[in-house]
Amino acid sequence: MNRYTTMRQLGDGTYGSVLMGKSNESGELVAIKRMKRKFYSWDECMNLREVKSLKKLNHANVIKLKEVIRENDHLYFIFEYMKENLYQLMKDRNKLFPESVIRNIMYQILQGLAFIHKHGFFHRDMKPENLLCMGPELVKIADFGLARELRSQPPYTDYVSTRWYRAPEVLLRSSVYSSPIDVWAVGSIMAELYMLRPLFPGTSEVDEIFKICQVLGTPKKSDWPEGYQLASSMNFRFPQCVPINLKTLIPNASNEAIQLMTEMLNWDPKKRPTASQALKHPYFQVGQVLGPSSNHLESKQSLNKQLQPLESKPSLVEVEPKPLPDIIDQVVGQPQPKTSQQPLQPIQPPQNLSVQQPPKQQSQEKPPQTLFPSIVKNMPTKPNGTLSHKSGRRRWGQTIFKSGDSWEELEDYDFGASHSKKPSMGVFKEKRKKDSPFRLPEPVPSGSNHSTGENKSLPAVTSLKSDSELSTAPTSKQYYLKQSRYLPGVNPKKVSLIASGKEINPHTWSNQLFPKSLGPVGAELAFKRSNAGNLGSYATYNQSGYIPSFLKKEVQSAGQRIHLAPLNATASEYTWNTKTGRGQFSGRTYNPTAKNLNIVNRAQPIPSVHGRTDWVAKYGGHR
């Protein structure tokens, strides 16, 4: 006890006195209950079966038993401190409580009581003095479970108020009683909250029974046979009384409140509702948010700055947590719904939103789309090399975006962005300081020929500058030269396009443009400036004949043939990486003597000897 400093006495109860104390270590205010009975060993203390369990009970409407101390044969219980009890709260009132306040108080009492009963305890001494509170917003049950073990036989005059809340079976000296006696006490306390005076203010045990009979009426033997047996064993005869309607005594109570009190104040303990059942009564099924308000935290802190933080408040009404904003709300204004992200997935224009089908349906009804960006059929060549928004190389290379922090915006719009490509942003940011081809887009005027009518609905965040401004910049050319996979001796400007005179459908690359494919669905393709009109926006942009590096495959020993990746290849075969290096993309090897290969012929690689790779033949002759 030398760890606590006693400050003043708070009260003197039946079984001990309560002192206000302060922890010397933390400065926290506590309530110290010093038991009147002496305990000469710890075994006697531990024989109080509640002592161990009470320390484990933790509920927002139950006073926490912090510590049990035995010193000089005296037993001390250290509780958390509350500034007042419900009796003081009612005594200081000069007008009746609103029913909403009473409902809130009652709900908290029943919440704590249901918790106690659930863990095998019942209070045995429920009364307003044992309901500690911080105003009407927070109520906690105190001193439960101690009464039975610490019960002495004091004169009833020592603590008169306890009698007013005793159940009839206790008054009739029943040897078997349980948690229903607490429910009876709660019903009496509820009536007192409405009236601000006790419902059964008996002056003795016999008078208490008379007071109960005056309100509830004389019980019938058929209604409570056990009660008549108890009365006969005490040579007691119930007075003959006519019941009084509780509504007459408590006019300010609602019909639901009268019904709940009538059920809890039943002569037969078996017919009383449990605390859990009482919580489900229609009296509590209202729109009111029950439970302690947030203000009680501030009031408790203002009372004692060092006071221990309150335990979590009870969820008296199962308040449904506010759901996270729907993903639909987050993508409002986006050109298309976000699907499962796949690397290098073609982007559909916003106008195709109404006819866009799920991926499974596309695979059933249409050939697999190419990894190239969507190309509009018969798109006319733009003057001055300007592009529509469907230029693919910008998306794949991620070289244009609105601002440095708009990466998430681009990902939300699903402009070819995938999780596997995010690391490339760090590489881009490092290179921007030296030779940055990136330029922030400017808003496109409504009357500009920058885009056709079909992509006018695109958000301003996707507005891009014309290609002529980007492709002619020296830094851009240097950057793309570094990023591309040009090989010595291969001039991509001299290659031609296969089937250049055929019409292009963005969904039928595999069967209209390339009747004879080298792979299962794919084909090879080379670009030239002379073919710009035939290939629409992509070839117009690709003036240098550059083939995007992620669509290349190096074939045979020295990359002598440049092939496009198979159109049906899985995305996992093409790991996104902006750094240049050889052997980056692995895939099947194609026959270099196949038809329709209008690429500069090179010498065939020297076959390996005995399964070993001839590195000189592979690299030495071309580097």
Swiss-Prot record:
The active site is at residue 125. It holds the Pfam family Pkinase. The keyword Transferase applies. GO terms for biological process: cell differentiation; cilium assembly; intracellular signal transduction; intraciliary transport; negative regulation of non-motile cilium assembly; non-motile cilium assembly; photoreceptor cell maintenance; protein autophosphorylation. Disulfide bonds: none annotated. Autophosphorylated. Phosphorylated on serine and threonine residues. Its cofactor is Mg(2+). Expressed in prostate cancer cell lines at generally higher levels than in normal prostate epithelial cell lines. Isoform 1 is expressed in kidney, testis, lung, trachea, and retina. Isoform 2 is retina-specific where it is expressed in rod and cone photoreceptors. The keyword Cytoplasm applies. SMART domains: S_TKc. It is an enzyme of class 2 (transferase). Transmembrane segments: none annotated. Residues 446-455 have a biased composition (Polar residues). Residues 4-284 form the Protein kinase domain. This is Serine/threonine-protein kinase MAK. The lineage of its organism: Eukaryota, Metazoa, Chordata, Craniata, Vertebrata. The gene is MAK.
